[in-house]
Amino acid sequence: MCIRDSGRALDEPASNKIRWGMLINTNQCSDECDACVTACNEEHGIEDFGRPTTDTQWIRKLKLTNDASGETINVPMMCQHCENPPCVDVCPTGASFVRADGIVLVNKHTCIGCRYCMMSCPYKARSFVHENLENQLPHAPRGKGCVESCNLCVHKIDNGDNSTACSEACQKDGQQAILFGDLNDSESEISKQLKKYKTTEVRSDLGLNTAVRYRGI
């Protein structure tokens, strides 16, 4: 039997004892760096068709400006993997769902491309695949006419690599802005930092209990 780093067998279903999430330190996210975006695109075979309004974006970097001070910060924005996701509530086929470990996913076989989930997402984190897809990667199947979004590199997690392409690239590039880990493990680095620092849940007023939190906002 093969065992993951988390102690879970490779053929064992996801467990609600774990909740995967991210802590993003905007103070460490620089203007000139797009390592997270590039890594995500390469990991999942996401191509740039030169149509910025419709091209698939699993991560996009937003720039926020403080009107009073004029200070700007960079905010990597992706699916926030809500505990109570609106996208799941509005999906008519059940294609959008939350896995036991908190990862929000889309079943490409049952997605009908209605895009209700895109309209319901307060983070504008989902994309509709308009183009024919070529050279797809075996670990990251995608489909024209489907909606998709960040899946926290679920293929890596399910193969025992408890990391994401974006967090690895951010660490490698020296920015160290993105930290990935188990929110339910009090001894994990992400849990320790969440206790130590003031963090923000984007649109906390909606009561979605997101798995992605930010510092510096």
Q: PLM features: what roles do these ranges have?
A:
Residues 4-217:
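Non-ligating segments of multi-cofactor redox enzymes
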